Every structure is written in C-alpha cells, then in structure tokens.
C-alpha cells in the first residue's frame, strides 16, 4: 500500500513491550513476553545509533529462541557499533518513545486485546492479525475507497 499509494499511507511502528514489568496496561491474563522491556529499549537504541541497520536488528531481536538481554545487547552492538549503542542507550528519547507507545496501547487495549493493532486514519483501529495479506489489502482499500 505504501508503494502503490505513497501519498495516502505510511507505516509508523509504535514500540509497546508486552510485559507488565514496564507496561502496566498489558492484561494480567496474558503471559509476559520474555525480556520485552529490555529488547524494546535495545531496538530503539539501535534505531537511534544507526537507523539504516535497524531492519537487521529487528530481525535479530525477533529471532527464536528469544535472546537473553546480555546476548541481545552484544548482538545489537555488533550490528550498529558497541560505542554507538552504549551512547544511544543513555538517550532519554528511548524512555519517552516507550512511554508514548504504552500510553497509546492503554487507549487501544480497552476495545480488544487482540494483537497486533493497526491504526488507520484518525480513529479506526484494526485489531488482530488478518487472515492473509489479501484480506488486509482489501480492508484498507474499502476503508479508503481506493478501488476504481
């Protein structure tokens, strides 16, 4: 959609750790994602240190099994540079972005606990994964009246 309608769509990733250690709004009946708080901080620090390398960091942090924080930090440092990562981890921007994402999550979780969330326009939120890429594209085309 961003390629076929660049003036209509953009993608903004909103980091929200699914872990009550740093996200008090994550539902108590769901299992925390191991190390989500630490990995979210590392991801944001990697973006801050070297945004061009962030996709590689993202893939590494979402690999299985989940990396313990110390191993993840070493892996991210290898990708973006150890000194750059250390400096970025000290940046207050990281906590500001996390708190913004958590605050937005608080508002969205009341409607449905299904993940992921896709915010469309000013007030439409799609909850949960779509059955297929085609179904998602059809939904967006319908919402934005993109069909001829």
What is the predicted role of each segment?
Residues 1-5, 9, 73-148:
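C-terminal cap of thioredoxin/glutaredoxin-like
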Residues 1-74, 146:
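Structural alpha/beta surface segment adjacent to cysteine/selenocysteine redox centers
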């Amino acid at each position: 959609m961003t390629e076929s309608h660049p003036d209509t769509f953009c993608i903004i990733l909103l980091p929200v750790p699914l872990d009550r250690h740093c996200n008090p709004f994550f539902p108590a009946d769901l299992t925390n994602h191991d190390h989500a708080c630490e990995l979210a901080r590392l991801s944001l620090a990697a973006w801050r240190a070297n945004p061009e390398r962030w996709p590689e960091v993202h893939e590494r942090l979402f690999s299985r099994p989940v990396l313990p924080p110390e191993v993840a930090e070493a892996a991210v440092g290898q990708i973006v540079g150890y000194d750059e990562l250390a400096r970025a981890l000290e940046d207050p921007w990281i906590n500001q972005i996390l708190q913004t994402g958590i605050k937005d999550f608080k508002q969205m979780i009341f409607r449905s606990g299904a993940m992921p969330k896709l915010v469309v326009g000013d007030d439409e939120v799609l909850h949960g994964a779509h059955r297929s890429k085609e179904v998602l594209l059809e939904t967006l085309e319908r919402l934005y009246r993109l069909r001829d």
